[in-house]
Curated annotation (Swiss-Prot):
Catalyzes the reversible interconversion of serine and glycine with a modified folate serving as the one-carbon carrier. Also exhibits a pteridine-independent aldolase activity toward beta-hydroxyamino acids, producing glycine and aldehydes, via a retro-aldol mechanism. Transmembrane segments: none annotated. The keyword Phosphoprotein does not apply. Pathway: Amino-acid biosynthesis; glycine biosynthesis; glycine from L-serine: step 1/1. The keyword Amino-acid biosynthesis applies. This is Serine hydroxymethyltransferase.
């Protein structure tokens, strides 16, 4: 396939060559040469990728399956209906709307459906991992919902349950939000849900980062513990196409939120996501528990290995992590911005991140790194590989080795881990071309 591009590219206009060359270079670099530890990313299987690249990316299907405002959607309707069934089964009998095109769109739909402008929302604090869409600067604020943070318990690296309960009873909000984008341990859903319901509030749990762990039964299903609504992304620990879902076990809430998804926040919902999401849902049905178990074991192994190599890893007294994430304080190595930049030069991709004790204005150069092991787990890495990754990181950030030298070793190391695991052994991708569905 590379030879094909080498022969054809010179025949194209310069501006087009530049775009295609950068796309090819990106694909080769990120997919085949780097160790990706971004906690919000993953890799679809070849079969899901083949299903993703379909004619559906050109089509519209506003509305609900079998009740569209467009013709020509008979097969889209059947696939979307199957997605709703599959995801509902994986989540223990939930009503699922797969039309949000992102986790934030899912959040916006749930927040808008359950509140009015001027209502109060009590949310998990930034220290406990709240996503930007939960804040006054993000979606909540944009919907003119008053944002009130729960107290944080630094010892347990979680919400302070007793103080949060008292706050909810005092404030009597319309909405309570748990979950987020940076958290190592499950939020206390049942305790908070009971209090929320006692004051007439609804609880929304943002499971964007942990959907794959929930489906794989390695993270509590918030719907089992009192959450009224769960929102999620379909492309983090759940290794599907980029997109979002809203799930609830209340048919009434499902109908209310669905009427907000369309037409308030979504018109067409990027239909080519649906076949790929269906493929991934079936993969998770058959392989999800193995995958989620290995993700959690790898995260713990990486945390322990990094600590052994001399890094300050958060949460040691709590066992480091129960999720796919690891948090590392790299102030001694120059701070999060410097560390992330050096690691990228070494072909190790991470993101700088605020740690619980960082002030909000440190966002451009925070104390920490947020690491996620889900994608490398998907490529077959296990506990011993986490030790190797920790050694690579130590050589760059503690020993001060030339990152370009380490990058060459990382590139060679990745050659053994290029095949997606925890999926069906069907590869419709041959030499870069799709032979199954096109």
């Amino acid at each position: 396939m590379l030879r094909f591009w080498q022969e054809k590219l010179p025949l194209l206009p310069q501006e087009l060559r530049e775009v295609l060359e950068k796309t090819i270079t990106h694909n080769l670099w990120r997919k085949y040469e780097t160790i990706n530890l971004i906690a919000s990313e993953n890799a679809m299987s070849p079969l899901a990728l083949a299903a993703y690249v379909s004619d559906m990316m050109h089509r519209y299907a506003e509305g609900k399956p079998f009740k569209r405002y467009y013709q020509g959607t008979r097969y889209v309707d059947e696939i979307e209906h199957r997605v709703m069934q599959l995801m509902g089964e994986l989540l223990g009998g939930a009503h699922v709307d797969p039309r949000p095109v992102s986790g934030t769109t899912a959040n916006a739909s749930a927040f808008r459906a359950l509140t009015n402008c001027g209502d109060k929302a009590v949310v998990a604090p930034v220290q406990a991992g709240a996503h930007v869409s939960h804040t006054k600067f993000g979606t909540l604020g944009g919907l003119c919902i008053e944002h009130i943070e729960m107290p944080y318990d630094p010892e347990n690296m979680n919400i302070d349950v007793d103080k949060a309960i008292r706050l909810i009873e005092e404030v009597r909000p319309r909405l309570v939000v748990l979950g987020g984008s940076v958290y190592l341990f499950p939020h206390p859903v049942k305790e908070i849900a009971d209090t929320a319901h006692s004051v007439g509030a609804k609880l929304v749990y943002d499971a964007a980062h942990v959907l794959g762990l929930i489906v794989g039964r390695r993270w509590r299903n918030p719907l089992d513990h009192g959450a009224d609504v769960m929102t999620a992304s379909t492309h983090k620990t759940f290794p599907g196409p980029q997109g979002g879902i809203v799930a609830t076990r209340s048919e009434e809430l499902y109908k209310t939120i669905s009427r907000v998804v369309f037409p308030v926040f979504v018109s067409n919902h990027h239909l080519h996501r649906l076949p790929a999401l269906a493929v991934t849902a079936v993969e998770m049905k058959y392989f999800g528990e193995q995958y989620a178990d290995q993700v959690v074991r790898n995260a713990k192994a990486l945390a322990e290995a990094l600590a052994a190599e001399g890094f300050k890893v958060l949460g040691e007294h709590l066992g480091y992590t129960k999720s796919h994430q690891v948090l590392v304080d790299v102030r001694a190595q120059g701070g999060g911005a410097k560390a992330a930049t050096l690691l990228e030069k070494a072909n190790i991709i991470v993101n700088k991140n605020l740690l619980p004790y960082d002030p909000p204005d440190a966002i451009k150069d925070p104390s920490g790194l947020r690491l996620g092991v889900q994608e490398m787990t998907r490529y077959g890495m296990k506990e011993d590989n986490m030790k190797d990754i920790a050694r690579f990181m130590r050589r760059v950030l503690i020993d001060g080795e030339d990152p370009e030298k380490v990058a060459r070793e990382v590139k060679e190391y990745r050659k053994e881990y290029l095949e997606v695991k925890y999926c069906f052994d069907v590869n419709p991708l041959e030499d870069g071309r799709l032979y199954l569905l096109l």
